[in-house]
Amino acid sequence: MIKRILLLLIFVSTISCGYETKLSKKNENNYNFSLEEMVFEGDRVINLKIKEKLNNYRLNKEAKNFTLKIKSTNSKVVTGKNLKGDPTNFKNIATLYVNVLVENNVKNTLKFKTSFNYYNNKNKFDLKKYEKNIKRNLAETMANELIFKLANIQ
């Protein structure tokens, strides 16, 4: 009984304190920047996910207006092998290089790097689907970081 009451008190106190995630739809309006143009180069899956996340800021006309030149890379590294020499562990590393331009002058150069470790799967079809999902998740993480950085550029 005490555990239930304690759990209820913790639940009520966290709801009533006004916690919001920093990238919620409600806070999206607080970011006072807009994107004139985005130029992509590199990995297609990563670029599509980042473009999807940044399109919300394209039509806004704010005081801070940026042009982005984005280059993305993705690599898969074998981190572990069994006695036969077959790979057992992998590491997927996604890197994003962003040049932030204001009136055709480079204002900032940003670099984001995320990685994810995972085990090999005997079913190669499932492994490819899993790797594509990992790539999308890494891209979404980097896109959220990029949005936060762009909002804080002076």
Question: Model features per residue range: what roles?
Answer:
Residues 14-34:
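Bacterial Sec signal peptide processing site at the extreme N-terminus
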Residues 29-40, 123:
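Acidic/histidine-rich, surface-exposed loop or edge segments in extracytoplasmic proteins
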Residues 129-154:
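Short, well-ordered alpha-helical segments
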